[in-house]
Each structure stands twice: as C-alpha cells, then as structure tokens.
C-alpha cells in the first residue's frame, strides 16, 4: 500500500483541513503515516500568519530534497503559504509537484493522478473562488474532539493580517449541514465539538435567511448527548448580546471565551482597523462577566505594532490587568508582506519589541496564577483526555473553562466527564482528586 505523510503548520483550521487531506489520501488508497522517510507522498499544510512560518517551510522543503531524489516522493504544499506564493514556490523549489490553495484541496486526487501518470510535471491550483471548499467528513481522533469549520475566509482586513488575501472573502456553511455534522460526530463518540472560523461570530452575515451565530449555537446545543462546545476565534466587535445570552443559558457551551485584544491602545486599535476602542472592549468584558459568572477569558495580543509608543503599550498592560485574562497568546509584531501595516512608518525596533513582550508576559503570568488560584477547594466537571504527557500514571483533563486538571484515575475514564476536587493550583495547571 502506498503511504502519505501530512505535516501541519499553523492554526486549528489548518489542523482540521489536514484531517480532510488525510481523508482524501485514504480514499485514494493511501496509508497515512507520520514516517516521512517511507512516504510516497508528503504534503505540507502551511501557514503564513507569522514571519517565522516561511523559514520553517523552506527548511522542511530543503530536508525533503533527499527523499525526492531517493524515492521520487510526490511533494505537495497546501494552505495559506501555498495560496500566497503560488507558482513562485515551484520556481524556488523545483522538487514541489503540487501547490494547492486553501479552497482547492478537493482537486488533490486529479493532481496526484496527473503526476503519477507523468501527464504533468507540476500542478498549481490557487484559485480564490467564492464557493465553499468541499465538505469532507474528517475522522476525529482518539482524543474525542471533532472540529468543524463553520466559516471560511475573512472580511475584516486588519492592517497586520494576511488572512483575507489568502483565504478569500467570508463564506458561511449552511446551518443545517453544521448541525448534521455535530449529530454524526456525537453519535460516533465525540465529547468535544470545536467550531472553527477566522471570525466565527460573524457567521451568517452572508445569508439572507436570518441564521446567525447565536442561532447556530442554540441549534447545536439541542443535539442530544453529553459533550462540550468550544469555538475559535470570535471578534470582539461582533460579540453581540444574543450570543452572550445563548452562551450563558447553555451548559454545553464552554465558559472559556477567546476575545482577541491585539492592543489596549485605542490609537493602535484604529491603525489596526479592529473596529473597537479600549473602552468598548472593557465594556464588553464587563457585560460578559456579569452575564456569565465564572467565565474565563483569553486573548491574542501584539506588541510593537508600528507607531506603538510606551503610553500605548501601557494601555495594553492596563487592559490585561483590568480584565485579568486566564491566558494570553502574546506576539511581537512581524511584518507580513502585502498588508497595510508592512508599509507604515515608525516600525518598532526588535529590542523594544522583545523588552515589551517580556514585561507583558510577566503581567499575564501573575493574572494567570491569580485566576487559577480561585479553583482551590472547588469541585469541577472535567472531560478526561487521557494520560498526562509528563506522567503516564496521571490522567489529564479540561474544565469547561479550559483549565488543565491532573489527577489519578483509571485510563478507562478517558472520554468521560467526571467531578474532580481541586487541591492545588499552579499557573497553568490544577491538581486534584476524583470525587
């Protein structure tokens, strides 16, 4: 049997799309393996959001040159970087046989056939079409988590982001199809449903039938079964009252909400084209906390955006302290060619970015520990995920607020919801015992 290997870079949407690529290869009769050295086809599913992504991809392509020469392995590149680079990738790396944009993975079978039959030396598909990518049933893994893309593309055009240019305009998947997917996954044993999109809470804006994100969440929660619903990533500007109400009333929906901040400075937020101010963001947080007691909030934050002053940075620190995020994904701004921010004046020196990032991390770590410490003595519902990575004799699970909990128990509990009493709290991990 022929073997294929898929290497994934980037966001959770890429992970989900890699699962679909895996399904395509399985339908073609390939055995999908992690052993690259024995693969007849290797596909890199790529990212282009951060500057270091290109370096990683180029490095891996360099490594694959020997495999190509030895086995004649078919080399494919998919994802955002493939969409952005197109033909240029083949020029830089002639070992590449197939380049597939985000919306073109359904064409993999015909591209493979052409390469195998020597009908073509290179196949490049980067059409940024308006229609939805093919709906392929992706098998969910042994972790009981099923991911479902509910939107594709993005209409926001934040000045630092390349995504709208490589993933196209926003398109929503029909509500009935998503609910059907949830029903099928839950029947197969899924305990965690993750809804994916570049901006999930703008779901349905391209519809004329009134379907929106609040209605979608409500309909999903009507599906019978014991499971939890999470979603990434929402946009603060589109976090409407009806969405907050649905989350508050439905126990199946995770009470950990990701609320990308990017900056705490209204001036920088305007330059980023984020559509909200510092004050509006804090007002939204207050509303969420009042409607959803015990909610955990996380964020994305960029430091060193062009023109960011010390005062702007201190505004970010101020928001982090006032909100007290459970966790933040913090990055130094990196130039992405093709975005408006790349040509802005007053680019910040790397040394300043690093220093600000370090200060921000110190503040966030204190907030994370403070939020974790609230759990001591509490009994929480935990979805058991399996053995801990560091200690196989200890089980690991997550709460509705996405806190990692470690405890001793039988491996047979994997995939079940259990109650755990928290005895010890550290910054990123809670420790407890089954009750």
UniProtKB/Swiss-Prot annotation:
[4Fe-4S] cluster 2 binds at residues 154, 158, 161. [4Fe-4S] cluster 1 binds at residues 11, 47, 80. The keyword Glycoprotein does not apply. GO terms for cellular component: cytosol. Its EC number is 2.8.4.3. It holds the Pfam family UPF0004. Residues 373-435 form the TRAM domain. Monomer. It catalyses: N(6)-dimethylallyladenosine(37) in tRNA + (sulfur carrier)-SH + AH2 + 2 S-adenosyl-L-methionine = 2-methylsulfanyl-N(6)-dimethylallyladenosine(37) in tRNA + (sulfur carrier)-H + 5'-deoxyadenosine + L-methionine + A + S-adenosyl-L-homocysteine + 2 H(+). Belongs to the methylthiotransferase family. MiaB subfamily. It comes from Fusobacterium nucleatum subsp. nucleatum (strain ATCC 25586 / DSM 15643 / BCRC 10681 / CIP 101130 / JCM 8532 / KCTC 2640 / LMG 13131 / VPI 4355). GO terms for molecular function: 4 iron, 4 sulfur cluster binding; metal ion binding; N6-isopentenyladenosine methylthiotransferase activity. This is tRNA-2-methylthio-N(6)-dimethylallyladenosine synthase. GO terms for biological process: tRNA methylthiolation. Keywords: 4Fe-4S, Cytoplasm, Iron, Iron-sulfur, Metal-binding, S-adenosyl-L-methionine, Transferase, tRNA processing.
């Amino acid at each position: 049997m022929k073997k294929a290997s898929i290497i994934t870079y980037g966001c959770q949407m890429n992970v989900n799309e890699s699962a679909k690529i895996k399904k395509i290869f399985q339908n073609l009769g390939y055995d999908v393996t992690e052993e690259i050295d024995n693969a007849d086809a290797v596909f890199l599913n790529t990212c282009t959001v951060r500057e270091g992504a290109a370096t990683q991809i180029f490095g891996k392509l360099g490594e694959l040159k020997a495999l190509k020469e030895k086995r004649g392995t078919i080399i494919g590149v998919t994802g955002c970087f493939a969409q952005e680079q197109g033909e240029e990738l083949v020029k830089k790396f002639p070992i590449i046989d197939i380049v597939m944009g985000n919306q073109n993975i359904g064409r993999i079978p015909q591209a493979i056939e052409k390469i195998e039959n020597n009908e073509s030396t290179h196949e490049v598909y980067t059409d940024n079409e308006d229609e939805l990518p093919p709906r392929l049933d992706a098998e969910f893994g042994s972790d009981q988590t099923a991911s479902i893309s509910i939107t594709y593309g993005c209409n926001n055009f934040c000045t630092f982001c390349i995504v709208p240019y490589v993933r196209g305009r926003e398109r929503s998947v029909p509500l009935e199809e998503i609910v059907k997917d949830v029903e099928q996954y839950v029947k197969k044993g899924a305990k965690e449903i993750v809804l994916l999109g570049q901006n999930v809470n703008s779901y349905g804006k391209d519809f004329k039938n009134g379907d929106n994100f609040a209605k979608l969440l409500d309909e999903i929660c009507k599906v019978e079964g014991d499971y939890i619903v999470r979603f990434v990533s929402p946009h603060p500007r589109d976090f409407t009252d009806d969405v907050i109400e649905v989350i508050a009333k439905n126990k199946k929906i995770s009470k950990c909400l990701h609320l990308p901040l990017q900056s705490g400075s209204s001036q920088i937020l305007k330059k980023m084209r984020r559509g909200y101010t510092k004050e509006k963001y804090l007002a939204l947080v207050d509303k969420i906390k009042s409607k959803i007691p015990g909610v955990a909030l996380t964020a994305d934050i960029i430091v060193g955006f062009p023109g960011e002053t010390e005062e702007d940075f201190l505004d970010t620190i101020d928001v982090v302290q006032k909100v007290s995020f459970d966790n933040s994904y913090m990055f130094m701004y990196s130039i992405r060619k093709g975005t408006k921010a790349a040509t802005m004046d007053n680019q910040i020196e790397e040394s300043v970015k690093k220093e600000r990032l370090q200060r921000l991390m110190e503040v966030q770590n204190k907030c994370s520990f403070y939020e974790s410490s609230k759990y001591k003595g509490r009994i929480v519902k935990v979805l058991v995920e399996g053995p801990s990575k560091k200690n196989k004799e200890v089980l690991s699970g997550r709460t509705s607020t996405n806190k990692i909990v470690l405890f001793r128990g039988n491996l047979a509990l994997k995939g079940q919801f259990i109650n755990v009493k928290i005895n010890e709290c550290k910054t990123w991990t809670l420790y407890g015992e089954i009750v």
